[in-house]
Regions:
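Active-site loop/helix belt of alpha/beta enzymes
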Residues: 2-13, 18, 170-308, 312, ...
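Charged (often Lys/Glu-rich) extended helix/loop segments that serve as interaction or gating elements
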Residues: 275-277, 282-410
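Electropositive phosphate-/nucleotide-binding environments in soluble metabolic enzymes
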Residues: 34, 50-57, 82, 86, ...
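Active-site beta-loop-alpha junctions enriched in small/polar residues
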Residues: 79-85, 103-106, 126-128, 147-151, ...
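A charged N-terminal "starter" segment
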Residues: 1-143, 149-162, 198, 204-210, ...
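Short acidic, glycine/serine/threonine-rich loops at helix termini
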Residues: 88-90, 112-114, 133-135, 155-158, ...
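Structural preference for beta-strand elements that scaffold enzyme active sites
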Residues: 75-77, 97-99, 118-122, 141-143, ...
Length: 410
């Protein structure tokens, strides 16, 4: 990870950029969702993920309010690939406030098992196998968005006359990094390209399919400054509407980003809703949005314990009991999980590098960050671990064990 700006953890330093009503220090103790983080994590010697159901529901409510303010009918679908912890999914399903965006047959099972009704599940994926197609054909009440001519042909053969959606590659991309940009100048595997559109329409007619939905997902992690490009991607896809007489819905995908450091901006939901209003208010189309990170990322922490502290070659290394395999985004996508001590010790801050326990040189959580004194056995909470962390984890070096806790209401 790149070095971060120094941040004071002194008790009188005022609020940190990430603090909010349900996350912050109280008398030197980091508290989350009304509980001491150190106390919540103390019952296990393994790495522990903590999730706040209340924060997830609050994020969902904020997004739904923004969607409502846009003056369009629509709904939110949680991208469950971001976090598939069953108690969390069940909480959302029982709330009735959102549906589920899924991208594999096993995610269909997870969504149904959590209690999401089939009518509130939408499937969008790529590189589908014949078995995938057969599975989708067995779920007539689940919405299906197809993203290739091959999938369209095989689905049409298997389920002629079905109502479907088509995922479009708008050739405009947005994202938190180049690796999170799903369309643009460089060809990608996602979506149907403009030069393929005539053939796609021919297949729709051949198999008697009814296209009710257009789908676009241009990338992940976009913030306010990328809204112009995001809207351009939607406009590109919306230009295809005249050739789709049965179109009733537009799925704008997910990708809504959250800040990871003090220097990052946030996504202005007012401007996001304004863009939706300007694009869709007069179209008569309903709008679906499929966020993952925006709903769950800042509702989760990963708590790791300090194994050792040692000076090597002029660098103070703080080793912890979990590595990048538990939360790959900091290494893969340069999306940091900022470390915060769970209890503040008195003393001067030191510049440290936090290292994981995986036998890979890149397994560094943070390099050259100023932190207050730490000791072996202390706990460190890594922020923004609620999305694409446990769900992307691996058992590399056979160190994939962890616990997950849905934090109870205080």
């Amino acid at each position: 990870m790149k070095p971060l700006p120094a941040a004071s953890f002194a008790l009188d330093a005022g609020k940190h950029w990430w603090e909010r009503a349900d996350l912050g220090f109280s008398n030197g103790e980091l508290c989350f969702a009304g509980h001491s983080v150190a106390a919540l994590a103390s019952w296990s010697d393994r790495p522990v993920f903590l999730y706040s159901g209340e924060r997830v529901l609050a994020n969902l409510a904020r997004l739904q309010a923004a969607l409502d303010s846009a003056g369009v009918s629509g709904a939110v679908l949680l991208a469950i690939k971001a976090n598939r912890f069953p108690p969390l999914l069940t909480t959302l399903a029982r709330s009735g406030r959102c549906g589920a965006d899924v991208c594999s047959p096993n995610e269909i099972k997870a969504a149904l098992s959590a209690g999401f009704p089939a009518e509130k599940i939408s499937f969008t994926a790529t590189s589908l196998s014949d078995d995938d197609i057969a599975n989708l054909a067995r779920h007539p009440r689940i919405a299906v968005n197809l993203d290739s001519l091959s999938a369209l042909r095989r689905f049409g053969e298997r389920a002629p006359g079905r109502t479907i959606g088509l995922r479009i590659n708008p050739e405009v991309g947005v994202g938190g990094s180049a690796k999170l940009t799903y369309s643009g100048r460089k060809p990608t595997k996602f979506g149907i390209y403009s030069e393929q559109w005539p053939e796609a329409l021919a297949m729709v007619r051949q198999y008697g399919l009814r296209v009710s939905t257009l789908h676009v997902h241009a990338g992940c992690g976009y913030l306010t400054e990328q809204l112009t490009s995001w809207r351009a991607a939607i406009d590109r896809a919306l230009s295809l509407r005249p050739s789709l007489p049965d179109l009733t819905c537009f799925n704008v995908g997910g990708g809504l980003g959250v800040p990871h450091t003090a220097t990052w901006g946030s996504l202005d939901l007012r401007l996001w809703a304004q863009a939706l209003h300007q694009t869709f208010a007069k179209t008569g189309l309903s709008v679906l949005v499929e966020p993952g990170d925006f709903i769950v990322k800042d509702a989760g922490l990963l708590v790791l314990k300090v194994n050792g502290i040692e000076d090597k070659g002029g660098t103070r290394f703080v080793s912890v009991n979990g590595g990048f395999n538990l939360a790959p985004e900091p290494v893969f996508y340069d999306l940091p999980c900022e470390p915060v001590p769970c209890r503040l010790r008195v003393g001067a801050e030191r510049r440290v590098t936090i290292a994981g326990n995986i036998n890979e040189a890149l397994d560094l959580w943070y390099e050259d960050i100023m932190l207050p004194p730490l000791a072996e056995g202390d706990s460190i909470a890594f922020l923004n671990a609620g999305g694409y962390a446990s769900s992307m984890s691996s058992n590399h070096c056979l160190r994939g064990d962890f616990e997950e806790i849905l934090v109870p209401q205080p």
